[in-house]
Structures are given as C-alpha cells and as structure tokens.
Amino acid sequence: MIIVTGGAGFIGSNIIKALNDKGITDILVVDNLKDGTKFANLVDLNIADYMDKEDFLIQLMAGEEFGEIEAIFHEGACSSTTEWDGKYMMDNNYQYSKEVLHYCLEHEIPFLYASSAATYGGRTSDFIESREYEQPLNVYGYSKFLFDEYVRQILPEANSQIVGFRYFNVYGPREGHKGSMASVAFHLNTQLNNGETPKLFEGSDGFKRDFVYVGDVAAVNLWFWENGVSGIFNLGTGRAESFQAVADAALAFHKKDSLEYIPFPEKLKGRYQAFTQADLTNLRAAGYDKPFKTVAEGVAEYMAWLNRN
C-alpha cells in the first residue's frame, strides 16, 4: 500500500493520478474533507481507502499497523502563505510532519514530503538548498523551513529514504478548491470564461517566478521514490518567467488579447516573492534528467484540461 497525505489536495491528487497511470491503485488517501469540494479531485482516481487526517495521526501515534506500506507521500499541510495563525501552522505543518517522519523511520518506509520555495523568503538569486540562503517571509515558509532543518539533523543516520521537495510555483489540474490561493492561470481562465477582462497586478511583466507544471512535479516524486534518493531538493523548472507570460498563454488559448492591470495590494508589499528561480544543480546531480514544461507549454495543456472538465 502507498499512503498519500493531502491526497484530496492539489499536488497529492496529481501524485495519485501518476500512480494510477502506472497501474498502482492500492492507495490510502489521508486528508481533511471538511471542505467537501475537494472530493472532486478524487472522483476519477482509483484508491483503496480513505482516512481523516486526525484519525490517521491517532493511529500512527498509537503505533498501529497499516499493513505493508511501500511509501508515504506526505503532501498534507496548510499551504496558505497568508495564514498568520502560527500555532495552527506549526501543528499542521511541523508537528504533524515529525510524527509521520518518525513512523516512517521506525518502520523503514520511504518518506517523500512537500517542502516549499517559501523557505527562501524575499531573495532574488541563489535559490540553493543550504541554510545560508534561507530566510522565510511568513509563518508558512517558516514551518516548512523548520521541518527541513529537523530533517537535516536526521538524514545522516537514517536507514530509509527521506526526501523533501521545495516546490516552486506549481500550477495545473486539480487546484480549483484552493480559491484565492489557486494559480494565476486558474484565475485568468475563470475570468475569461465569465466574459470578464482578465486582471493582473501592475508590473506583472517584472514579477518573475519559477512556474512548474504539476504533472512534472508528480513525475519527479515518483522518480525519486523509484530510485531511492534522499535529500532536500528544489523542484522547479530552473527558469523564471513572468506573470505576463502566463497571461499571454491563457489569452492565446482563449483567442483574446485584452488585459486589465490593477494596483498591487498594500497588504502584500514586503511579504511577496517578486522573483523565484530554482537552482536545479542538486536535482540534476541526483540523476533526474527529464525536461520541464515551459509556461507556454504547461498553461496550454492546463487550459485544455480546465475547459474540458
């Protein structure tokens, strides 16, 4: 059996899709379906069982067995960069992750988990997986950073696989439940389908991020599991492309050409990553050599999926 925490969420459900594509269906999904709309991410997938995240944690801490587990993909977390309840964030993203990690170590189960590029904070260069480059801007980024630091202490002595992925700006299918935290591509598509003029922040040609397609993210997760590599790795494309490029790709799909530029919100100033670009040196050195979709390629594929579903 494979366990995917956050399996009804964005990246988790895409990992399940990738597993299904390999004929793997003996999957336990762990999540919180209080937001019932997330069920839609699972309806076309094949899984063996579902468990609430709190029930899973209770069983885990009690040392209960779940049968033979081949791997745990730990994608479950609060991923809102605008959430400032630090206790909630640390309980969800730090303490919970420690419990799952120690269960995996005790049972020698491969543990693959979601870290984040938010660990780097507001820097504009050298996005490198090393302490001197890490200074998160928000409590979400801090929760991810602190767990990475915890993992670094354990990695040298670990007898089973531990691998963390610092996701950059992931976009693609199955993110609709995220609301305001969904990607710019998702929001532009919604606006275009509603007959609105799509909106971007002023200066969006200068805001550049490493936009990575979720199908590529799932592929990297599976490759590392299959190859047993441990460590903490950036997971982006290695390219920084502008929000304007995302909009251009969405407009091209919809055969439109007009955009409205709106003022940048005061509340985001100083708490916003204006530039991200993954350094893929360590990822490539680990042996992952497949290409990543460009914004033009990924957004076109995503637009086709959104307007088919």
From Swiss-Prot:
GO BP annotations of the record are:
ADP-L-glycero-beta-D-manno-heptose biosynthetic process; carbohydrate metabolic process
Record flagged with keyword Amino-acid biosynthesis: no
Query: Active site located where?
Result: 140 (proton acceptor), 178 (proton acceptor)
Which cofactors go with this protein?
NADP(+)
NADP as UniProt keyword? yes
Record: residues binding NADP(+): 10-11, 31-32, 38, 53, 75-79, 92, 144, 170, 178
What Pfam families does the record tag this protein with?
A: Epimerase
Q: In which pathway does it act?
A: Nucleotide-sugar biosynthesis; ADP-L-glycero-beta-D-manno-heptose biosynthesis; ADP-L-glycero-beta-D-manno-heptose from D-glycero-beta-D-manno-heptose 7-phosphate: step 4/4
Q: Which of this chain's residues are annotated to bind substrate?
A: 169, 180, 187, 201-204, 209, 272
Instruction: Extract the PANTHER family matched here.
Output: ADP-L-GLYCERO-D-MANNO-HEPTOSE-6-EPIMERASE (PTHR43103:SF3), NUCLEOSIDE-DIPHOSPHATE-SUGAR EPIMERASE (PTHR43103)
Outline the subunit composition. Answer: Homopentamer.
UniProt lists the family membership as follows:
Belongs to the NAD(P)-dependent epimerase/dehydratase family. HldD subfamily.
Q: What is this protein called?
A: ADP-L-glycero-D-manno-heptose-6-epimerase
What organism does the UniProt record list as the source? Answer: Enterobacter sp. (strain 638)
